[in-house]
Amino acid sequence: MTIYNFSAGPAVLPKPVLVKAQSELLNYQGSSMSVLEVSHRSKEFDDIIKGAERYLRDLMGIPDNYKVIFLQGGASLQFSMIPLNIARGRKAYYHVAGSWGKKAYTEAVKLSKTIPFEPILLASSEESVYDYIPEFDEKEIDPEAAYVHVTTNNTIEGTSLYDIPKTNGVPVIADMSSNILAVKYKVEDFAMIYAGAQKNIGPAGVTVVIIREDMINEEPTLSSMLDYKIQSDASSLYNTPPAYSIYIAKLVFEWVKSLGGVDAMEKANREKSGLLYDYIDSSEFYSNPVRDKKSRSLCNIPFITINKDLDEKFVKEATERGFKNIKGHRSVGGMRASLYNAFPKQGVIELIDFMKTFEAENA
Protein backbone atom coordinates (compact mmCIF):
# COMPACT_ATOMS: atom_id res chain seq x y z
CA MET A 1 0.00 0.00 0.00
CA THR A 2 1.32 3.42 -0.96
CA ILE A 3 1.36 5.93 1.89
CA TYR A 4 0.53 9.56 1.13
CA ASN A 5 1.45 12.07 3.83
CA PHE A 6 -0.93 15.04 3.93
CA SER A 7 0.64 16.52 7.07
CA ALA A 8 0.65 20.31 7.32
CA GLY A 9 4.10 20.17 8.88
CA PRO A 10 6.47 18.51 9.40
CA ALA A 11 5.58 17.53 5.89
CA VAL A 12 6.49 15.24 3.03
CA LEU A 13 10.04 15.61 1.71
CA PRO A 14 11.21 14.87 -1.85
CA LYS A 15 12.21 11.22 -2.23
CA PRO A 16 15.46 12.10 -4.10
CA VAL A 17 16.45 14.32 -1.17
CA LEU A 18 15.86 11.51 1.33
CA VAL A 19 17.82 9.06 -0.81
CA LYS A 20 20.79 11.41 -1.07
CA ALA A 21 20.66 12.18 2.64
CA GLN A 22 20.63 8.46 3.35
CA SER A 23 23.67 7.89 1.16
CA GLU A 24 25.63 10.64 2.94
CA LEU A 25 24.51 9.82 6.46
CA LEU A 26 27.46 7.59 7.34
CA ASN A 27 30.16 9.15 5.18
CA TYR A 28 29.65 12.73 4.05
CA GLN A 29 31.49 13.34 0.77
CA GLY A 30 34.42 11.12 1.68
CA SER A 31 35.05 12.76 5.06
CA SER A 32 34.56 9.46 6.94
CA MET A 33 32.16 11.41 9.16
CA SER A 34 28.39 11.43 9.18
CA VAL A 35 26.83 14.66 8.01
CA LEU A 36 25.30 14.66 11.50
CA GLU A 37 28.79 14.87 12.98
CA VAL A 38 30.57 17.54 10.97
CA SER A 39 31.52 20.65 12.92
CA HIS A 40 29.65 23.84 12.12
CA ARG A 41 33.10 25.47 11.89
CA SER A 42 34.38 22.95 9.36
CA LYS A 43 34.96 23.43 5.64
CA GLU A 44 32.30 20.79 5.00
CA PHE A 45 29.61 22.76 6.79
CA ASP A 46 30.84 26.06 5.38
CA ASP A 47 30.16 24.61 1.93
CA ILE A 48 26.71 23.42 3.06
CA ILE A 49 25.47 26.70 4.52
CA LYS A 50 26.94 28.86 1.77
CA GLY A 51 25.48 26.52 -0.82
CA ALA A 52 22.06 26.68 0.83
CA GLU A 53 22.11 30.46 0.74
CA ARG A 54 23.35 30.54 -2.84
CA TYR A 55 20.59 28.21 -4.07
CA LEU A 56 17.90 30.10 -2.14
CA ARG A 57 19.05 33.45 -3.53
CA ASP A 58 18.93 32.03 -7.03
CA LEU A 59 15.49 30.43 -6.60
CA MET A 60 13.84 33.52 -5.12
CA GLY A 61 15.84 36.21 -6.92
CA ILE A 62 17.00 37.71 -3.62
CA PRO A 63 18.77 41.05 -4.24
CA ASP A 64 22.23 41.75 -2.86
CA ASN A 65 20.91 44.27 -0.34
CA TYR A 66 19.04 41.53 1.51
CA LYS A 67 20.64 39.29 4.11
CA VAL A 68 19.78 35.61 4.46
CA ILE A 69 19.96 34.24 8.01
CA PHE A 70 19.35 30.68 9.20
CA LEU A 71 17.92 30.80 12.71
CA GLN A 72 16.33 28.55 15.31
CA GLY A 73 13.11 28.82 17.30
CA GLY A 74 10.64 28.32 14.46
CA ALA A 75 8.59 31.03 12.82
CA SER A 76 6.91 31.56 16.20
CA LEU A 77 10.09 33.07 17.64
CA GLN A 78 9.95 35.67 14.88
CA PHE A 79 6.70 36.93 16.40
CA SER A 80 8.91 38.29 19.19
CA MET A 81 12.11 39.04 17.29
CA ILE A 82 10.41 41.32 14.78
CA PRO A 83 9.06 43.88 17.26
CA LEU A 84 12.15 43.56 19.46
CA ASN A 85 14.43 44.49 16.57
CA ILE A 86 12.30 46.64 14.31
CA ALA A 87 9.38 48.31 16.11
CA ARG A 88 11.54 50.74 18.14
CA GLY A 89 8.78 52.78 19.75
CA ARG A 90 6.73 53.13 16.58
CA LYS A 91 3.42 51.75 15.37
CA ALA A 92 3.33 48.21 13.99
CA TYR A 93 0.33 47.06 11.95
CA TYR A 94 -0.93 43.48 11.77
CA HIS A 95 -3.07 42.08 8.97
CA VAL A 96 -4.75 39.02 10.49
CA ALA A 97 -6.25 36.55 8.02
CA GLY A 98 -5.72 33.35 10.00
CA SER A 99 -4.72 31.72 13.25
CA TRP A 100 -0.98 32.28 12.77
CA GLY A 101 -1.43 35.96 11.99
CA LYS A 102 -3.51 36.21 15.17
CA LYS A 103 -0.68 34.60 17.14
CA ALA A 104 1.81 37.09 15.72
CA TYR A 105 -0.44 39.98 16.71
CA THR A 106 -1.15 38.52 20.17
CA GLU A 107 2.57 38.16 20.84
CA ALA A 108 3.14 41.75 19.78
CA VAL A 109 0.44 42.97 22.16
CA LYS A 110 2.05 41.00 24.97
CA LEU A 111 5.48 42.49 24.24
CA SER A 112 4.10 46.01 24.03
CA LYS A 113 3.34 45.89 27.75
CA THR A 114 7.07 45.89 28.50
CA ILE A 115 8.67 47.29 25.32
CA PRO A 116 7.63 50.70 23.93
CA PHE A 117 5.78 50.30 20.62
CA GLU A 118 2.15 50.24 19.49
CA PRO A 119 0.79 47.11 17.79
CA ILE A 120 -2.35 47.87 15.77
CA LEU A 121 -4.85 45.42 14.31
CA LEU A 122 -5.13 46.67 10.72
CA ALA A 123 -7.70 44.16 9.46
CA SER A 124 -9.06 40.79 10.56
CA SER A 125 -11.45 38.13 9.30
CA GLU A 126 -11.69 36.36 12.66
CA GLU A 127 -15.42 37.09 12.90
CA SER A 128 -16.07 34.58 10.10
CA VAL A 129 -13.44 32.04 11.17
CA TYR A 130 -10.95 33.45 8.66
CA ASP A 131 -12.81 32.25 5.59
CA TYR A 132 -11.63 35.23 3.51
CA ILE A 133 -8.70 37.64 3.19
CA PRO A 134 -9.68 40.98 4.77
CA GLU A 135 -9.02 44.24 2.94
CA PHE A 136 -7.96 47.62 4.30
CA ASP A 137 -7.44 51.19 3.16
CA GLU A 138 -3.76 52.09 3.02
CA LYS A 139 -4.66 55.61 4.14
CA GLU A 140 -5.39 54.11 7.56
CA ILE A 141 -1.66 53.37 7.93
CA ASP A 142 0.66 55.90 9.54
CA PRO A 143 3.50 56.40 7.02
CA GLU A 144 5.96 56.62 9.94
CA ALA A 145 5.04 53.13 11.19
CA ALA A 146 7.72 50.48 11.58
CA TYR A 147 6.08 47.78 9.49
CA VAL A 148 2.94 46.01 8.31
CA HIS A 149 2.93 42.28 9.12
CA VAL A 150 1.12 39.85 6.81
CA THR A 151 0.86 36.07 6.46
CA THR A 152 0.96 34.86 2.87
CA ASN A 153 -0.63 31.45 3.47
CA ASN A 154 -2.97 30.28 6.20
CA THR A 155 -2.40 26.58 6.75
CA ILE A 156 -5.38 26.01 9.03
CA GLU A 157 -8.02 27.93 7.12
CA GLY A 158 -6.76 27.35 3.57
CA THR A 159 -6.44 30.91 2.29
CA SER A 160 -3.56 32.76 0.65
CA LEU A 161 -2.53 36.36 0.07
CA TYR A 162 -1.30 36.45 -3.52
CA ASP A 163 -1.35 40.19 -4.24
CA ILE A 164 0.57 42.21 -1.67
CA PRO A 165 -1.55 45.24 -0.73
CA LYS A 166 -0.30 48.81 -0.77
CA THR A 167 0.74 50.01 2.69
CA ASN A 168 1.27 53.77 2.33
CA GLY A 169 5.01 53.28 1.93
CA VAL A 170 5.41 51.29 5.16
CA PRO A 171 7.69 48.21 4.94
CA VAL A 172 5.92 44.85 4.65
CA ILE A 173 7.06 41.87 6.72
CA ALA A 174 5.70 38.47 5.66
CA ASP A 175 5.35 35.15 7.39
CA MET A 176 5.81 32.92 4.34
CA SER A 177 6.25 29.67 6.25
CA SER A 178 3.78 27.53 4.34
CA ASN A 179 4.05 28.72 0.74
CA ILE A 180 7.64 29.86 0.34
CA LEU A 181 9.03 28.31 -2.88
CA ALA A 182 5.51 27.06 -3.71
CA VAL A 183 4.18 30.36 -5.06
CA LYS A 184 6.27 33.02 -6.75
CA TYR A 185 6.61 36.33 -4.95
CA LYS A 186 8.87 39.28 -5.71
CA VAL A 187 11.28 39.63 -2.79
CA GLU A 188 11.57 43.39 -3.35
CA ASP A 189 7.89 43.73 -2.38
CA PHE A 190 8.89 42.87 1.18
CA ALA A 191 11.27 44.38 3.70
CA MET A 192 11.52 41.00 5.39
CA ILE A 193 10.37 37.44 4.77
CA TYR A 194 10.57 34.63 7.28
CA ALA A 195 9.64 30.97 7.07
CA GLY A 196 9.78 27.92 9.26
CA ALA A 197 11.32 25.09 7.28
CA GLN A 198 8.97 22.19 7.95
CA LYS A 199 6.63 22.62 4.99
CA ASN A 200 8.45 23.38 1.73
CA ILE A 201 12.07 23.74 2.87
CA GLY A 202 12.99 20.73 4.98
CA PRO A 203 12.66 19.27 8.47
CA ALA A 204 11.74 21.32 11.51
CA GLY A 205 14.60 23.07 13.29
CA VAL A 206 15.65 25.91 11.04
CA THR A 207 13.92 29.18 10.19
CA VAL A 208 14.90 31.19 7.13
CA VAL A 209 14.97 34.98 7.49
CA ILE A 210 15.40 37.20 4.43
CA ILE A 211 15.78 40.79 5.58
CA ARG A 212 16.62 44.01 3.77
CA GLU A 213 19.79 45.55 5.15
CA ASP A 214 18.18 48.85 6.13
CA MET A 215 15.74 46.96 8.37
CA ILE A 216 18.49 45.44 10.48
CA ASN A 217 18.74 47.08 13.88
CA GLU A 218 21.79 49.18 14.73
CA GLU A 219 21.07 49.26 18.46
CA PRO A 220 21.38 46.01 20.46
CA THR A 221 18.20 44.20 21.45
CA LEU A 222 17.23 42.51 24.68
CA SER A 223 19.22 39.36 23.88
CA SER A 224 22.12 38.58 21.56
CA MET A 225 20.35 35.43 20.37
CA LEU A 226 17.36 37.55 19.35
CA ASP A 227 19.40 40.23 17.58
CA TYR A 228 19.25 40.28 13.76
CA LYS A 229 22.45 42.30 13.47
CA ILE A 230 24.44 39.92 15.65
CA GLN A 231 23.05 36.87 13.86
CA SER A 232 23.67 38.41 10.43
CA ASP A 233 27.18 39.63 11.26
CA ALA A 234 27.99 36.11 12.48
CA SER A 235 26.73 34.60 9.21
CA SER A 236 24.17 32.48 11.11
CA LEU A 237 26.95 31.04 13.29
CA TYR A 238 26.60 33.10 16.47
CA ASN A 239 25.98 29.77 18.19
CA THR A 240 25.80 26.22 16.86
CA PRO A 241 23.17 26.29 14.10
CA PRO A 242 20.72 23.47 13.27
CA ALA A 243 23.30 22.00 10.94
CA TYR A 244 21.43 18.95 9.70
CA SER A 245 18.25 20.91 8.98
CA ILE A 246 20.30 23.39 6.94
CA TYR A 247 21.91 20.49 5.08
CA ILE A 248 18.51 19.04 4.14
CA ALA A 249 17.30 22.52 3.15
CA LYS A 250 20.24 22.80 0.75
CA LEU A 251 19.29 19.46 -0.83
CA VAL A 252 15.67 20.61 -1.16
CA PHE A 253 16.77 23.86 -2.81
CA GLU A 254 18.86 21.84 -5.28
CA TRP A 255 15.85 19.62 -5.99
CA VAL A 256 13.56 22.60 -6.62
CA LYS A 257 16.12 24.10 -9.00
CA SER A 258 16.52 20.79 -10.85
CA LEU A 259 12.78 20.74 -11.57
CA GLY A 260 12.67 24.26 -12.97
CA GLY A 261 12.55 26.50 -9.91
CA VAL A 262 9.65 28.25 -8.23
CA ASP A 263 7.76 28.81 -11.49
CA ALA A 264 7.66 25.06 -12.06
CA MET A 265 6.64 24.42 -8.46
CA GLU A 266 3.75 26.88 -8.68
CA LYS A 267 2.56 25.37 -11.96
CA ALA A 268 2.57 21.87 -10.47
CA ASN A 269 0.86 23.08 -7.31
CA ARG A 270 -1.89 24.78 -9.30
CA GLU A 271 -2.47 21.54 -11.19
CA LYS A 272 -2.59 19.43 -8.02
CA SER A 273 -4.80 21.76 -6.03
CA GLY A 274 -7.00 22.42 -9.06
CA LEU A 275 -7.87 18.74 -9.35
CA LEU A 276 -9.01 18.58 -5.74
CA TYR A 277 -10.85 21.91 -5.73
CA ASP A 278 -12.67 21.02 -8.96
CA TYR A 279 -13.88 17.74 -7.50
CA ILE A 280 -14.98 19.33 -4.21
CA ASP A 281 -16.84 22.08 -6.08
CA SER A 282 -18.63 19.52 -8.26
CA SER A 283 -19.81 17.54 -5.25
CA GLU A 284 -22.85 18.16 -3.05
CA PHE A 285 -21.30 15.90 -0.40
CA TYR A 286 -18.02 17.77 0.16
CA SER A 287 -17.40 21.48 0.58
CA ASN A 288 -14.53 23.93 1.04
CA PRO A 289 -15.06 26.79 3.52
CA VAL A 290 -13.11 29.52 1.70
CA ARG A 291 -15.50 32.24 0.56
CA ASP A 292 -13.44 33.71 -2.30
CA LYS A 293 -12.07 31.14 -4.75
CA LYS A 294 -9.29 33.54 -5.80
CA SER A 295 -7.98 33.42 -2.21
CA ARG A 296 -7.84 29.64 -1.99
CA SER A 297 -4.51 28.19 -0.92
CA LEU A 298 -2.51 26.03 -3.31
CA CYS A 299 -0.83 24.30 -0.38
CA ASN A 300 -3.53 23.61 2.23
CA ILE A 301 -7.04 22.54 1.26
CA PRO A 302 -9.55 22.11 4.09
CA PHE A 303 -12.83 20.35 3.36
CA ILE A 304 -15.77 18.76 5.14
CA THR A 305 -18.54 16.28 4.41
CA ILE A 306 -22.23 16.84 5.17
CA ASN A 307 -21.83 16.23 8.92
CA LYS A 308 -19.20 15.81 11.63
CA ASP A 309 -19.87 12.11 12.17
CA LEU A 310 -19.06 11.44 8.52
CA ASP A 311 -15.96 13.62 8.83
CA GLU A 312 -14.69 11.33 11.59
CA LYS A 313 -15.55 8.25 9.57
CA PHE A 314 -13.78 9.71 6.53
CA VAL A 315 -10.59 10.37 8.49
CA LYS A 316 -10.61 6.85 9.94
CA GLU A 317 -11.16 5.09 6.63
CA ALA A 318 -8.81 7.36 4.71
CA THR A 319 -6.05 6.70 7.23
CA GLU A 320 -6.60 2.95 6.88
CA ARG A 321 -6.23 3.34 3.10
CA GLY A 322 -2.86 5.07 3.44
CA PHE A 323 -3.93 8.73 3.36
CA LYS A 324 -2.09 9.80 6.49
CA ASN A 325 -2.45 13.01 8.51
CA ILE A 326 -5.53 14.15 6.63
CA LYS A 327 -7.46 15.18 9.73
CA GLY A 328 -8.16 18.91 9.86
CA HIS A 329 -6.68 21.18 12.50
CA ARG A 330 -8.26 20.70 15.92
CA SER A 331 -9.57 24.28 15.88
CA VAL A 332 -11.70 23.78 12.76
CA GLY A 333 -12.19 20.02 12.39
CA GLY A 334 -13.00 18.30 9.13
CA MET A 335 -10.18 17.30 6.82
CA ARG A 336 -7.18 19.04 5.31
CA ALA A 337 -5.03 18.01 2.36
CA SER A 338 -1.65 19.71 2.48
CA LEU A 339 -0.16 19.63 -1.01
CA TYR A 340 3.32 21.06 -0.62
CA ASN A 341 5.97 21.00 -3.34
CA ALA A 342 7.08 17.43 -2.61
CA PHE A 343 3.57 15.98 -2.56
CA PRO A 344 2.96 13.91 -5.72
CA LYS A 345 0.10 14.54 -8.13
CA GLN A 346 -0.70 10.83 -8.04
CA GLY A 347 -1.58 11.17 -4.37
CA VAL A 348 -4.24 13.75 -5.24
CA ILE A 349 -5.66 11.51 -7.97
CA GLU A 350 -5.92 8.56 -5.58
CA LEU A 351 -7.42 10.71 -2.83
CA ILE A 352 -10.15 11.87 -5.21
CA ASP A 353 -10.87 8.25 -6.15
CA PHE A 354 -11.27 7.43 -2.46
CA MET A 355 -13.48 10.49 -1.94
CA LYS A 356 -15.76 9.36 -4.77
CA THR A 357 -16.09 5.90 -3.26
CA PHE A 358 -16.74 7.29 0.21
CA GLU A 359 -19.40 9.63 -1.14
CA ALA A 360 -21.14 6.81 -3.02
CA GLU A 361 -21.23 4.68 0.13
CA ASN A 362 -22.32 7.42 2.54
CA ALA A 363 -24.35 10.05 0.70
Swiss-Prot record:
Q: Which GO terms describe its cellular component?
A: cytoplasm
Catalytic reactions of this protein: O-phospho-L-serine + 2-oxoglutarate = 3-phosphooxypyruvate + L-glutamate; 4-(phosphooxy)-L-threonine + 2-oxoglutarate = (R)-3-hydroxy-2-oxo-4-phosphooxybutanoate + L-glutamate
Cytoplasm as a keyword of this entry, yes or no, is yes
Q: Spell out the subcellular localization from the entry.
A: Cytoplasm
User: What InterPro entries does the record tag this protein with?
Assistant: Aminotrans_V_dom (IPR000192), Pser_aminoTfrase (IPR022278), PyrdxlP-dep_Trfase (IPR015424), PyrdxlP-dep_Trfase_major (IPR015421), PyrdxlP-dep_Trfase_small (IPR015422)
Binding residue positions for pyridoxal 5'-phosphate: 75-76, 100, 155, 175, 198, 239-240
Any one biological process term the GO annotation gives: pyridoxine biosynthetic process
Which Enzyme Commission numbers does its entry carry? 2.6.1.52
Per its UniProt record, the required cofactor names are: pyridoxal 5'-phosphate
**A Pfam family it matches:** Aminotran_5
User: Which residues participate in L-glutamate binding?
Assistant: 41
Q: Which UniProt keywords apply?
A: Amino-acid biosynthesis, Aminotransferase, Cytoplasm, Pyridoxal phosphate, Pyridoxine biosynthesis, Serine biosynthesis, Transferase
Positions of modified residues (N6-(pyridoxal phosphate)lysine): 199
Note on cofactor: Binds 1 pyridoxal phosphate per subunit.
**What pathway is it annotated to?**
Amino-acid biosynthesis; L-serine biosynthesis; L-serine from 3-phospho-D-glycerate: step 2/3
Please name the top-level EC class of this enzyme.
Answer: transferase
Question: Main role?
Answer: Catalyzes the reversible conversion of 3-phosphohydroxypyruvate to phosphoserine and of 3-hydroxy-2-oxo-4-phosphonooxybutanoate to phosphohydroxythreonine.
What PANTHER family does its record include? PHOSPHOSERINE AMINOTRANSFERASE
Assembly behavior: Homodimer.
* Family membership: Belongs to the class-V pyridoxal-phosphate-dependent aminotransferase family. SerC subfamily.
**Record NCBIfam families:** PRK05355.1, serC_1
The name under which this protein is listed is Phosphoserine aminotransferase
Q: Which organism is it from?
A: Streptococcus agalactiae serotype III (strain NEM316)
